[in-house]
UniProtKB/Swiss-Prot annotation:
Its EC number is 2.4.2.1, 2.4.2.2. The keyword Oxidoreductase does not apply. It comes from the Bacteria. This is Pyrimidine/purine nucleoside phosphorylase. Transmembrane segments: none annotated. It comes from Hydrogenovibrio crunogenus (strain DSM 25203 / XCL-2) (Thiomicrospira crunogena).
């Protein structure tokens, strides 16, 4: 899906790591939400409350998922799942565009 229809976008950005990571929240009529974001090159760690599916739209990253010891390389068109109440590491090699879907 390359676009979303009939949604509400929260105007204020979610900004992390001194502006190197930012996203916008997209709210859907069914109560679900996603964030669309941009990651600048660097290494970051994020915590989750809800389970997430991170879809890479552009760029190259390595991710270290909870319970894993080996980094996984991903690029545009690939995705990874993160369990609720966990942390994951992400090493952004090139500017990365992503869509994060939150799973209840």
């Amino acid at each position: 899906m390359s676009q979303f229809e009939n949604v509400t976008v929260v105007k204020a950005a979610n900004v992390y790591y001194d502006g190197k990571v930012s996203s916008r929240t997209v709210l859907f009529a069914d109560g679900s939400k996603k964030t669309l974001g941009l990651l600048l090159p660097g290494e970051y760690e994020f915590g989750t409350e809800a389970a997430e599916i991170m879809e890479m739209l552009a760029g190259d990253v390595d991710v270290l998922l909870p319970g894993e010891t080996k980094w996984q390389s991903l690029s545009a068109g690939e995705s990874f799942n993160v369990p609720a109440n966990s942390k994951f590491g992400i090493n952004v090699k090139t500017v990365a565009d992503y869509c994060c879907s939150y799973i209840d």
